[in-house]
Amino acid sequence: MVPNIKSSTITIDPKVQVIDNFLDSYRFEQLQSCILDQNFDWYYLDGINGDDNPRGSYQFTHGFVVNDSIKDSTNFPLISSVCNSLGCNKLNRIKVNLNPRTIFHRNGGYHLDAPDSLFMKVAILYINTNNGWTNIKGHGKVKCVANRLVKFHSSMSHAGYSCTDEKRKVVLNFNYE
């Protein structure tokens, strides 16, 4: 259970915003319960991103919005509340990533979500707390804490690092304007 604590914003860099307790506890618990449910549909992806895939890397994903089109209409109402809180005008992609625990922290590879877009932003909502993190190249490291959101411009190179202490690291990734 996530306590109903008021959100707080941390700025690790003028270009990166970190918001703890981004959603109220009720909405977050609904979202977390849906995504972590054993019957939630996951799809295997050989590799973590298209640019720099370390050998043996893989993840499971679930697309809610792909190429501006809603792909999971059943669960989209839970996601739309996050979009409203973010102030999204246009959705390009929303997907949830599940990275299994590894023996040591693995860098998933640096990448850009939308390098050619002037207006696209990235938001990552951490679904579970673990000892993994996101590194935003030249701007700092954001630890995986449940209900923490990090926002930055899509032209900023970033990489996810796996966890070693929990069964899985789960993040909800938004590309939006």
Regions found by a protein language model. Name each.
Residues H105-Y110, L118-M120, Y126-V145:
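A short beta-strand-loop-beta hairpin characteristic of the jelly-roll/cupin
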Residues A123-L125, E166-E177:
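A short hydrophobic beta-strand segment most commonly corresponding to one strand
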Residues V142-H158:
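Conserved metal-binding segment of the jelly-roll/cupin
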Residues F76-S81, L86, K90-L118:
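Internal catalytic-core helix/loop-beta-alpha segment
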Residues V2-K90:
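Non-heme Fe(II)/2-oxoglutarate
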Residues L98-P100, I127, Y176:
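Short beta-strand segments enriched in hydrophobic/aromatic residues
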Residues G109-H111, S157-D165:
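Short beta-strand His + acidic residue motifs that chelate non-heme Fe in jelly-roll/DSBH
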